[in-house]
């Protein structure tokens, strides 16, 4: 919504795993965000709260890792340059995060965190005919001089609370036609490298619906460094369904983690496949004021450590409403 009628935007969201009555597994999250543009600049602020519980593949046996977090943030973004076929975007924000963690249902006192941090990112988008190319990078970290409880790094009791994480990403979207049918290929690559010791909450995690699909997310691989490669091949179903905005798709993902803590994992690489249906439509009788988007899929693990247990196939569904 636009409460001040200044092209500002207020959004409120809540999400959960499908088993709403099971408070011992999965995740819950809620957030509120507000932004207001001024020319090529945009000011934004937000707050969020989340709870999660997952099983991580350990060296000898699975580890049940969980926790809660609360975060407030504010920042600014700017479009430093733009042209008919390209655009650049830069963003800087500061945040305060409070979190606690549990290991096998036991509170980890040394992992209680109350930290102040920052994040800077830069992205460039380029249009080449119908192809869209995205590249970007960023850095995020903590400001220990303003933090009450920076957390604890295993094996480094003298850690000063300062962390620095470098990130990079690249993406390609390529639409094309086969026998008159509209199709598209999309690939996205992401990488993280920790320049300093970091707490487990900042590890790069793979094996869920966001990073290497085909796994149920109850057991994951996580370490200081990592990368993922996500591939999607989609088919426009608008003509077949006589309604625009719907796609069938197939995906193939691979990811790998690394860093000092990866030596304790039973494996470092995951690969998975997924097929699904996604789309967006205005709800009937709502005068286009309410729209719904959905994504339903089935996935399968293709490569994993033997000790990492997951359902197969993995069914996932997402339903979102916009007012």
What kind of feature is each model-predicted range?
Residues 16-20, 49-51, 255, 298-302:
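Acidic, glycine-rich active-site loops and adjacent beta-strand->loop/helix elements
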Residues 4-6, 21-24, 83-84, 129, ...:
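Short glycine/serine/proline-enriched coil/turn segments at secondary-structure junctions
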Residues 154-323:
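C-terminal transmembrane beta-barrel domains of outer membrane proteins
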Residues 37, 42-200, 257-260:
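Transmembrane beta-strand segments of outer-membrane beta-barrel domains in Gram-negative
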Residues 9-13, 33, 42-46, 73-75, ...:
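Residue-level detector of the transmembrane beta-barrel scaffold of outer-membrane proteins
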Residues 25, 53-67, 206-224:
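Surface-exposed coil loops of outer-membrane beta-barrel proteins
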Residues 24-26, 68, 114, 269:
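Short, glycine/acidic-rich beta->alpha junctions
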Residues 1-46, 82:
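Outer-membrane beta-barrel initiation region
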């Amino acid at each position: 919504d636009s409460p001040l009628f200044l092209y500002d935007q207020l959004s409120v969201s809540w999400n959960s795993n499908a088993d709403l009555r099971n408070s011992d597994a999965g995740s819950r999250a809620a957030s509120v965000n507000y932004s207001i543009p001024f020319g090529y600049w945009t000011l934004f602020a937000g707050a969020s709260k989340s709870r999660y519980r997952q099983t991580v593949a350990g060296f000898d046996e699975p580890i049940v890792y969980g926790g809660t977090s609360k975060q407030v943030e504010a920042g600014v973004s700017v479009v430093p340059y733009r042209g008919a076929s390209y655009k650049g975007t830069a963003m800087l924000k500061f945040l305060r995060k409070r979190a606690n963690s549990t290991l096998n249902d036991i509170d980890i006192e040394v992992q209680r965190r109350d930290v102040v941090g920052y994040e800077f990112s830069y992205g460039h988008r380029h249009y080449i005919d119908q192809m869209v190319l995205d590249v970007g990078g960023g850095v995020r970290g903590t400001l220990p001089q303003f933090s009450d409880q920076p957390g604890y790094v295993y094996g480094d009791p003298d850690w000063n609370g300062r962390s620095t994480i470098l990130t990079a990403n690249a993406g390609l979207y390529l639409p094309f036609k086969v026998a008159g049918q509209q199709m598209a290929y999309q690939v996205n690559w992401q990488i993280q490298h920790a320049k300093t010791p970091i707490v487990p909450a900042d590890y790069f995690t793979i094996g869920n619906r966001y990073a290497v699909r085909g796994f149920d997310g109850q057991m994951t691989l996580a370490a200081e460094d990592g990368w993922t490669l996500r591939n999607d091949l989609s088919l426009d179903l608008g003509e077949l369904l006589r309604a625009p905005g719907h796609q069938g798709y197939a995906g193939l993902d691979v990811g790998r983690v690394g860093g000092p803590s990866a030596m304790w994992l039973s494996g470092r690489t995951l690969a998975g496949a997924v097929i699904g249906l996604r789309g967006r439509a205005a709800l009937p009788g709502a005068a286009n004021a309410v729209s719904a988007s959905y994504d339903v899929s089935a996935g399968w693990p293709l490569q994993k450590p033997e000790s990492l247990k997951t359902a197969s196939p993995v069914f996932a569904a997402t339903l979102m409403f916009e007012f």
